[in-house]
Design a protein with these regions (language model features):
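Charged, glycine-rich active-site and insertion segments that engage polyanionic ligands
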Residues: 2-49, 55-57, 65-69, 183-186, ...
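Clamp-loader machinery-focused feature within the broader ASCE/P-loop NTPase space
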Residues: 2-169
Length: 381
C-alpha cells in the first residue's frame, strides 16, 4: 500500500516519508486514531515506504518485490498481531493471530485497509457480544518471531493492530522488548484507544497521531462515489466527522435508518429527562441496552453530535450548524436547555458511557446511570 492510496492526510504522509529519508526511524511507534481516519492503512504504507528499494517522490514504488509482499501483508519480515477469538472456544484453548491471517489479509485487501474492529469481529463470526483479544501466549509468539534474523528487508517489523485488546499479562510481557529491542527491529502499534494501554507501553513509544480527514477531502470523496448534489456532499462530509468509513455508510444510505433510530432515542431521552420521568428513563435504558454494542456506541456518538449542534444553536452560531429536517426542528426547540454550564458535563458523561460499553460493561447498568445523570444535567442552566 502506497501513501498515494491513503485518502487525505497529506501533511502526515509527507512527515512520515521525511523521517525515513532522514534516517529518523523510532524503533517503537504508536499510531493513534479511528479506523476511518486511515490509521491501519497509513501504518502499512509507512512500513512499505521504509522497506521499498526504489522510493521516489516521497512514496514507495509499489512494484518491487518488497512493496508487493507488504501490500499483500505477506512479507516474511512483516509480522502481524491482531485481536482474535471464536465461538465455542474451549477452556484453556490457545488462539493466535496466525490462525486467522488469511481472513485478515482478505479483509484488508477488500477494504484497502479501512475497516473497523466490529467489521473484523463480524468476519470472525463472533456475534453481538463476543470480542477479540490478544492473549499472553501471543506475546510469547511476538518475542519468538522477533528473535530471528530478518529474511530480506533491513528491518523486522511487528505490526500490532488494536494493542488495547491485550490483557495485562500480554502487555507486561512485551515491555522489555519494547524498551530494548533487537537491532533493526521495528514495533508499530495501531490503536484506536491509546488511553486503554498501559502507561508504561505508551511511554516506550513515539506517538503518531492520525487526525480526522479534512471535510473538503471527504466532500471530494463523496463526489467521487456518485453524490451529485454539492449541498448533499457537503452535509455528508460534515456528518462523517473526518471518518471515511462513516462517509461510506452515508453515501450508501446505510446510516439513514440507524441515524433515525438514534435520533428517536435521543429525543425520547431528552424529553423524559426534562420531565423527570425517572421510571420511564429506566425503561429507556433497558431498550438502549438491547442494541448491539457497536450500535450503542454509535448512538452515543450521535447524541454527542446533536448536543454539540444544539449548543451552537444556543450560542447563536447557526451558520456553522449542519442540521436539517427533523433534527434541526428538534434541536432548535431543545437548544435553550444546552448551555455553557452543562454542555461539558453532558459530553463527559457520554464519553464515560462509551468507554464503559467498549470495556464490556453491563449495558443496562451503564445506560441507567447515563440516563439518570443526563436528567440531572438538562435543567442545570
Amino acid at each position: 500500500m502506497r501513501f498515494a492510496d491513503i485518502t487525505g492526510q497529506d501533511d502526515l504522509k509527507r512527515h512520515l516519508a521525511q523521517t525515513v529519508d532522514a534516517g529518523r526511524v523510532s524503533h517503537a511507534q504508536l499510531f493513534t486514531g479511528a479506523s476511518g481516519f486511515g490509521t491501519l492503512a497509513l501504518a502499512v504504507a509507512y512500513v512499505q515506504y521504509l522497506c521499498c528499494r526504489y522510493r521516489r517522490n516521497g512514496d514507495s514504488c509499489g512494484e518491487c518485490p518488497d512493496c508487493r509482499q507488504i501490500e499483500a501483508l505477506a512479507h516474511p519480515d512483516l509480522h502481524l498481531v491482531f485481536p482474535v477469538n471464536k465461538q465455542g472456544k474451549k477452556s484453556g484453548e490457545v488462539i493466535r493471530s496466525d490462525e486467522f491471517l488469511p481472513q485478515f489479509r482478505t479483509l484488508f485487501a477488500e477494504r484497502r485497509g479501512y475497516f473497523s474492529p466490529q467489521e473484523w469481529y463480524d468476519r470472525l463470526d463472533l456475534g453481538k457480544t463476543l470480542k477479540g483479544m490478544i492473549a499472553a501466549r501471543e506475546a510469547d509468539e511476538i518475542i519468538r518471531k522477533l528473535s530471528f534474523k530478518s529474511f530480506e528487508a533491513d528491518y523486522k517489523t511487528m505490526l500490532v493492530w488494536l494493542p488495547e485488546t491485550m490483557n495485562e499479562e500480554a502487555a507486561n510481557k512485551i515491555l522489555k522488548i519494547l524498551e530494548e529491542p533487537w537491532e533493526r527491529t521495528l514495533f508499530i502499534l495501531v490503536s484506536e484507544h491509546p488511553d486503554r494501554l498501559l502507561p508504561t507501553i505508551v511511554s516506550r513509544t513515539q506517538e503518531v497521531c492520525v487526525p480526522r480527514i479534512a471535510p473538503e477531502v471527504l466532500e471530494r470523496e463523496a463526489f467521487a462515489r456518485g453524490v451529485a448534489d454539492p449541498l448533499q456532499a457537503r452535509n455528508m462530509a460534515r456528518l462523517a466527522d473526518g471518518d471515511l468509513l462513516e462517509l461510506g455508510h452515508l453515501v450508501a444510505g446505510e446510516s439513514d435508518a440507524q441515524r433515525k433510530e438514534h435520533f428517536d432515542l435521543f429525543c425520547s431521552l431528552m424529553r423524559l429527562s426534562y420531565n423527570d420521568k425517572h421510571l420511564e428513563l429506566v425503561t429507556w435504558a433497558e431498550d438502549a441496552a438491547q442494541l448491539s454494542r457497536e450500535q450503542q456506541r454509535g448512538f452515543l456518538r450521535d447524541a454527542a453530535r446533536l448536543l454539540r449542534e444544539s449548543y451552537m444553536l444556543h450560542a447563536g452560531i447557526r451558520e456553522i450548524s449542519y442540521l436539517w429536517g427533523e433534527e434541526l426542528a428538534f434541536c432548535t426547540k431543545f437548544a435553550p436547555f444546552v448551555g455553557s454550564q452543562n454542555i461539558e458535563p453532558l459530553i463527559a458523561e457520554i464519553e464515560s458511557a462509551s468507554a464503559q460499553i467498549a470495556q464490556n460493561g453491563n449495558p443496562t447498568i451503564v445506560f441507567t446511570h447515563f440516563a439518570l445523570s443526563v436528567s440531572k444535567m438538562i435543567k442545570h442552566l
